[in-house]
Amino acid sequence: MDSNTVSSFQVDCFLWHVRKRFADQELGDAPFLDRLRRDQKSLRGRGSTLGLDIETATRAGKQIVERILKEESDEALKMTIASVPASRYLTDMTLEEMSRDWFMLMPKQKVAGSLCIRMDQAIMDKNIILKANFSVIFDRLETLILLRAFTEEGAIVGEISPLPSLPGHTDEDVKNAVGVLIGGLEWNDNTVRVSETLQRFAWRSSNENGRPPLPPKQKRKMARTIKSEV
């Protein structure tokens, strides 16, 4: 196993522990708590994949961080912070909408890269909107936290979420996954639109009908993919 992979996991475990202590003091806002919860799932998945104990890794990560901080000057820290571009966290969904449990009458699931696409194919003839919480850097989608499909009545009928065991995805991965979800929902004569925020930062454009600029050929392909593979 690569040593950098192990040490990276150890540092991530310790930094998560620090963030958890911060949250335990009721100091974290909603985006902070949301990332904390999802990063916990990711660490568990990575720990299982690597065969490493999280508690032991956290202790090792603490030693690594302490060594770095001991060698770090205040001036170097200021320069590092100034050189790192800041990302923004954007929310279409409330914390309640993100954490709400939902159930499917006809569950369908597809894994696309490091993203998991789930939908209820029993849903027909509904108006559906896709909402997402995600981070943005340089005015482009950086990391998808969670995307969910809602009916006008507020019911959740679909979802795209990162797989904890396979961290890392691009904005193209997200756009492809959205295309798959739209194709599957439209197969049952649902009308699907995407939130303006997601359109703006994933596609850098928006349409009046709420549709991302997916070519007709791609949309037909997405629908066939959902029907045959999901």
Curated annotation (Swiss-Prot):
Positions of region (Disordered): 205-230
Region annotation (PABPN1-binding) ranges: 223-230
GO cellular component, one term: host cell cytoplasm
GO terms of biological process kind: symbiont-mediated suppression of host cytoplasmic pattern recognition receptor signaling pathway via inhibition of RIG-I activity; symbiont-mediated suppression of host gene expression; symbiont-mediated suppression of host mRNA processing; symbiont-mediated suppression of host PKR/eIFalpha signaling; symbiont-mediated suppression of host type I interferon-mediated signaling pathway
UniProt KW RNA-binding keyword: yes
Subcellular location: Host nucleus; Host cytoplasm
PTM characteristics: Upon interferon induction, ISGylated via host HERC5; this results in the impairment of NS1 interaction with RNA targets due to its inability to form homodimers and to interact with host EIF2AK2/PKR.
InterPro entries: NS1 (IPR004208), NS1A (IPR000256), NS1A_effect_dom-like_sf (IPR038064), uS15_NS1_RNA-bd_sf (IPR009068)
Annotated segments matching region RNA-binding and homodimerization: 1-73
Sequence motif Nuclear localization signal, location on chain: 34-38
Pfam families, alphabetized: Flu_NS1
Gene Ontology molecular functions: protein serine/threonine kinase inhibitor activity; RNA binding
UniProtKB keywords: Eukaryotic host gene expression shutoff by virus, Host cytoplasm, Host gene expression shutoff by virus, Host mRNA suppression by virus, Host nucleus, Host-virus interaction, Inhibition of host innate immune response by virus, Inhibition of host interferon signaling pathway by virus, Inhibition of host PKR by virus, Inhibition of host pre-mRNA processing by virus, Inhibition of host RIG-I by virus, Inhibition of host RLR pathway by virus, Interferon antiviral system evasion, RNA-binding, Ubl conjugation, Viral immunoevasion
Motif mapping: Nuclear export signal: 137-146
Family: Belongs to the influenza A viruses NS1 family.
Domain-related comment: The dsRNA-binding region is required for suppression of RNA silencing.
Function in brief: Inhibits post-transcriptional processing of cellular pre-mRNA, by binding and inhibiting two cellular proteins that are required for the 3'-end processing of cellular pre-mRNAs: the 30 kDa cleavage and polyadenylation specificity factor/CPSF4 and the poly(A)-binding protein 2/PABPN1. In turn, unprocessed 3' end pre-mRNAs accumulate in the host nucleus and are no longer exported to the cytoplasm. Cellular protein synthesis is thereby shut off very early after virus infection.
Subunit field text: Homodimer. Interacts with host TRIM25 (via coiled coil); this interaction specifically inhibits TRIM25 multimerization and TRIM25-mediated RIGI CARD ubiquitination. Interacts with human EIF2AK2/PKR, CPSF4, IVNS1ABP and PABPN1.
More details: South Carolina isolate has been sequenced from formalid fixed-lung tissues of a 21-year-old male which died in 1918 at Ft. Jackson, SC. Brevig Mission isolate has been sequenced from lung tissues of an Inuit woman buried in the permafrost in a gravesite near Brevig Mission, Alaska. This sample was recovered by John Hultin, retired pathologist.
Name of the protein in question: Non-structural protein 1
Organism: Influenza A virus (strain A/Brevig Mission/1/1918 H1N1)
Chain's gene name: NS
